[in-house]
Amino acid sequence: MNFFSVRTYRFLRALVLGIFRIIHPKVVVSGRENIPEGACILSSNHSAFSDPIWLVGYANLPTMPRVMAKQELTKVPVISWFCKKLGCIFVNRDGNDLVAIKTAMKTLREGEKLVVFPEGTRVRDGKPSEPHIGAVLLAARTRCPIVPAYVTMHKKLFRAIHVVIGRPYYPKASAKPSPEELEAGTTQLMKTIYGLGEGLQ
């Protein structure tokens, strides 16, 4: 759970987006209506540090979702403090982080929304590099839908930012998915995410 009240979260969202709109005055959002009530996994491409801000900010969620973030951010002074205040779930990407997985599952089962970037870190060329299976695993284990999303990859100054939110779906995987199911589901997820951005760059 994040430490900010709903009121504070909404104030900070408006403040940060206002600042970002100075360098990107035009933001085009589509598919916001696809986000279901209750628990779901918002899963997007990741090409810049600002992606969580564009995605969470323009999804216009009533409360702050929890975001899965790489553990390396805990070593960055200001960002580390802010991420902790927002209730981010830090993940060790070098192996199976059972603590992070259990925390994420608990979050979803309590009806909260979760943001997961399958690529695990910024990918600048638009081609996923060994995406992680976490989003599909969590969806399979909790039976929560995945909501694919795409955020403009090449964020040039004063150019439009597109945030495209796709329809929710349940990956084809059993409650205790095999490695093959997880790999296939993750491949399909990345195809869906990048498919949302076709023709937008």
Give the predicted meaning of each segment:
Residues 1-30, 77-86:
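A transmembrane-helix-recognition feature enriched in membrane-embedded lipid enzymes
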Residues 3-8, 100-201:
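Non-catalytic C-terminal accessory region of glycerolipid acyltransferases
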Residues 16, 85-90, 118-121:
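Short, basic, glycine/proline-bearing loop/turn elements
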Residues 17-23, 90-94, 124-126:
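Short, flexible loop segments at the rims of nucleotide/cofactor-binding pockets, characterized by
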Residues 20, 60, 82-83, 107, ...:
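A generic structural signal for well-ordered alpha-helical segments
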Residues 26-28, 96-100:
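Glycine-rich, highly charged phosphate/nucleotide-binding loops
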Residues 34-37, 109:
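Flexible, charged surface loops at secondary-structure boundaries
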Residues 36-95:
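Catalytic core of membrane glycerolipid acyltransferases/transacylases, capturing the structured
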